[in-house]
């Protein structure tokens, strides 16, 4: 009888140990702590929203941020790589193609998050080096006071219509990550190609530093229509500003902006915990609150978005992220020649 009781205790103890291994650190394990530096292009208002949440959930982790546009972050990383190391533990920028380049160069840590199974499968790197963390949708924005319903552009090519001459704008792909991948995608598209940008140039397109600058000029009336992210329009509309958004029928650009852990991180445990948080429902709610679609199909759409991301994907512009990752300078040089000079 005593032997049976001892066996029972051993089985229970083994089960508890197994459960602890599956669900998290074993009882008595040291809490994850230390500094985590995140390089990101995510909006400052989302960072400010996240700071108290992260502090409450992870009191022993000092989460620090370097904020800048995607191209600014990439420039910083390249400079740090040349010096031999980077201060970044995690990166979150809006250029999926760049993560392919980092993966090829051995700069990312392989990590299969337990939250990967909740994401759209094609937005998780098949080898586990990164995954989407937020969605950006590039489409067409317009000033409701300047554009009548009958004149609304329906396709990307409509931006080249002479009636918008001098009144159409776009963010600069040399400075903005979302503008770069949108430009690269359209340039590779058989329906568009570089002839689309040649047509925009003939229509006196205004090239602004970023999406925020395009939004500002649309609201001031300097522009009537333009290439802009859905999240800019949703946020502006929530504040009562007269902006509308159109998903071009010839393919909105859907950008699964990723998150990845740098291979050189000195705090893998903390970096993984923060990575997991961003892919959790709580972390993704902050993304949705920031007017962007979630990478999880079980999350709601941003407030007042006309379509769910699963529906936008059905007619989105096809994107070859691997090919785009191999020709960033070629795309930027071509755009510079056609549009900026």
Where are the model-predicted features located?
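Bacterial N-terminal signal peptides
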Residues: 10-21
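Short, polar/charged alpha-helical segment
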Residues: 31-64, 140
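Extracytoplasmic ligand-binding site segments that recognize negatively charged/polar headgroups
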Residues: 41-48, 68-71, 86-222
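A ligand-binding cleft/hinge motif common to bilobed small-molecule-binding domains
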Residues: 97-101, 219, 224-242, 291
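Periplasmic-binding protein-like
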Residues: 121, 136, 197-201, 207-208, ...
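A bilobed periplasmic-binding-protein/Venus flytrap-type ligand-binding module shared by bacterial periplasmic
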Residues: 139-146, 183-187, 255-268, 286-287
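Mature extracytoplasmic/periplasmic domains
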Residues: 257, 262-319
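Extracellular/periplasmic bilobal clamshell ligand-binding domains
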Residues: 304-341
């Amino acid at each position: 009888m005593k032997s049976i009781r001892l066996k029972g205790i051993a089985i229970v103890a083994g089960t508890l140990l197994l459960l602890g291994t599956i669900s998290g650190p074993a009882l008595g394990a040291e809490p994850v702590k230390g500094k985590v530096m995140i390089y990101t292009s995510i909006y400052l208002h989302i960072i400010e929203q996240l700071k108290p949440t992260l502090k409450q959930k992870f009191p022993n982790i000092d989460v620090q941020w370097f904020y800048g546009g995607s191209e600014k972050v990439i420039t910083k990383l390249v400079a740090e790589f040349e010096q031999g190391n980077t201060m970044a533990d995690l990166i979150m920028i809006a250029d999926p193609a760049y993560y392919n380049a980092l993966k090829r160069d051995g700069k990312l840590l392989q990590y299969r998050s337990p939250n990967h199974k909740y994401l759209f499968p094609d937005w998780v790197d098949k080898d586990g080096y990164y995954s989407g963390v937020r969605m950006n949708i590039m489409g067409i924005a317009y000033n409701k006071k300047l554009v009548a319903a009958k004149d609304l552009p329906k396709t990307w090519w409509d931006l080249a219509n002479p009636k918008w001459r001098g009144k159409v704008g776009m963010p600069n792909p040399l400075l903005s990550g979302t503008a770069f991948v949108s430009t690269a995608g359209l340039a590779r598209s058989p329906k568009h190609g570089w002839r689309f940008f040649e047509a925009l140039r003939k229509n006196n397109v205004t090239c602004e530093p970023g999406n925020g600058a395009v939004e500002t000029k649309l609201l001031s009336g300097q522009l009537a229509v333009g290439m802009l992210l859905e999240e800019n329009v949703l946020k502006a509309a929530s504040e009562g500003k007269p902006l509308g958004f159109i998903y071009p029928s010839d393919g909105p650009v859907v950008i699964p902006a990723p998150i990845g852990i740098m291979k050189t991180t000195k705090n893998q445990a903390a970096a993984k915990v923060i990575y997991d948080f961003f892919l959790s429902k709580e972390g993704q709610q902050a993304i949705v609150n920031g007017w962007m679609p979630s990478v999880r199909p079980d999350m709601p759409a941003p407030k007042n978005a006309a379509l769910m991301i699963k529906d936008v994907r059905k007619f989105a512009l096809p994107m070859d992220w691997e090919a785009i990752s191999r020709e960033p300078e070629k795309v930027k040089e071509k755009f510079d020649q056609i549009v900026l000079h």
